[in-house]
Amino acid sequence: MLLIDIASTSLNVGGTSSRLAKVERIAELLRAAAPDPELVAIVVAWLSGELRQRQIGVGWAALRSLPAAAGSPALTVTGTDAAFSEIGAVSGKGSAARRRELITRLFAAATETEQAFLVRLLSGELRQGALAGIMVDAVARAAEVPATAVQRAAMLGGDLPTVAAACLAAGSSGAAGALDSFTLRVGRPIGPMLAQSAGSITVALERHGGATIFEAKLDGARVQIHRTGDEVTVYTRSLDDVTARLPEVVQATLALPVSDLVADGEAIALQPDGRPHRFQVTASRFGRSVNVAAAQAKQPLSVFFFDILHRDGRDLLDAPTTDRLAALDAVVPARHRVDRLTTADAAAATDFLRATLAAGHEGVMAKSPTAPYLAGRRGAGWLKVKPVHTLDLVVLAVEWGSGRRRGKLSNIHLGARDAATGEFVMLGKTFKGMTDAMLDWQTARFTELAVGGTDGYVVALRPEQVVEVAFDGVQASSRYPGGLALRFARVVRYRDDKGPADADTIDTVRALY
């Protein structure tokens, strides 16, 4: 298969608003790739906006000056993927020049259509929230299996390209069996369960229809922990392996009386009095260039387990919350568990929320006692209750500031994700809540994300940066395309641990109106 086949499909898919048309066009390409599992995996990864290599050290700056395009298509898909691997493997002295040389060679062999696709793929412009859902549907269509089966296999396998390759290689008669082979496996990360928002304790109790399990919601970093014997691996919310950076989590896990374990938890930096540090202190321990020993000595992390998905040969994904917590409590000491209260009484739950907030945490999680663990899905079984409304939105553009903020990229344009189209719907602007340090940081960050330069008053951005925004409410507005705007929006923090696919949807905003 040639690169032009994928580039043309991407162009075609981007040019139609019909979800069904997008799905069918991608499914058609997948059927053509089906005889070769590796080819299928590449197609799925690229059209989902991802590289199989994850990161290859090529940023927007490296793509600004490109050679003339080739006259006719000759690049193969597998050859291009191999070129990505070669670029990503470059390191050491002279690596920047060598990487530029390889990029130039690749782009010189690409046609204009292929170059445009490669730029979007390498710069992250293909990453949109709806792509994952469209790709799941396309794989299901091509393999003639239910989309729900593909989604579950991908969540348990942790990797849609791998699932798609196995499913399509098995043919229509064996696809269902291939999907069934993807089960929870210790050592292979799965998509984490996500929570919906609830406006109050009362709402959470009503939605769960009675007694609810309330847990302290810590403002740390989500971790998924796997243990097999004496080997422990730790993954982030985005399924990156951070084992080497979190020795405290490894040590705490090895101290548990288990042989095999998959657990969900939170790593957090605490002050001497037990109150949490601001999130950025915790996040600093996750950097790739961190000196782990020095960072651990300066600011150790604590780990708190709040769910268990597998223990010593028993899968617990489909077990109700009460059973999973009983299995957790049997092996995890209280000092490593989040505070918890089970009640149907709103007053008692409100007191628990107040105590949690007084301890410096951000709110509570309300969990249905009967809910299974929905890997990779946002369900009503988990509800987050915070004292103020917050949303995770994407920064679409930014304006140059004036007065104290002159010379800084300041007023940010906020967008919610449209799950149906993968586009973002603007909800307003804000510069409230920004410190001087934040203004300095975002000026540098948004210069990197700028599309078409930074000379204009309004600087358009690639929709990649997620920001947590607090607000007082949602109001009707004819000014914005979604008909809604946020009241008194202010920046809480930038969420580098989340991507645009994790941003809240416009449907979530509508539900708050």
Curated annotation (Swiss-Prot):
Catalyzed reaction equations: ATP + (deoxyribonucleotide)n-3'-hydroxyl + 5'-phospho-(deoxyribonucleotide)m = (deoxyribonucleotide)n+m + AMP + diphosphate
GO biological process: one example: DNA biosynthetic process
InterPro entries: ATP-dep_DNA_ligase, DNA_ligae_ATP-dep_bac/arc, DNA_ligase_ATP-dep, DNA_ligase_ATP-dep_C, DNA_ligase_ATP-dep_cent, DNA_ligase_ATP-dep_CS, DNA_ligase_ATP-dep_N, DNA_ligase_N_sf
Gene name in the database record: lig
Name of the featured protein: Probable DNA ligase
Residue numbers binding ATP: E215, R222, R237, E266, F306, R378, K384
SUPFAM superfamilies (alphabetical): ATP-dependent DNA ligase DNA-binding domain, DNA ligase/mRNA capping enzyme, catalytic domain, Nucleic acid-binding proteins
GO molecular function: ATP binding; DNA binding; DNA ligase (ATP) activity; metal ion binding
Physiological role: DNA ligase that seals nicks in double-stranded DNA during DNA replication, DNA recombination and DNA repair.
Active site: K217
Domain of life: Bacteria
Broadest EC class assigned to this enzyme: ligase
Cofactor(s) required for function per UniProt: Mg(2+)
EC number: 6.5.1.1
Keyword Cell division: yes
Signal peptide: none
Family: Belongs to the ATP-dependent DNA ligase family.
Record carries keyword DNA repair: yes
Alphabetic keyword roster: ATP-binding, Cell cycle, Cell division, DNA damage, DNA recombination, DNA repair, DNA replication, Ligase, Magnesium, Metal-binding, Nucleotide-binding
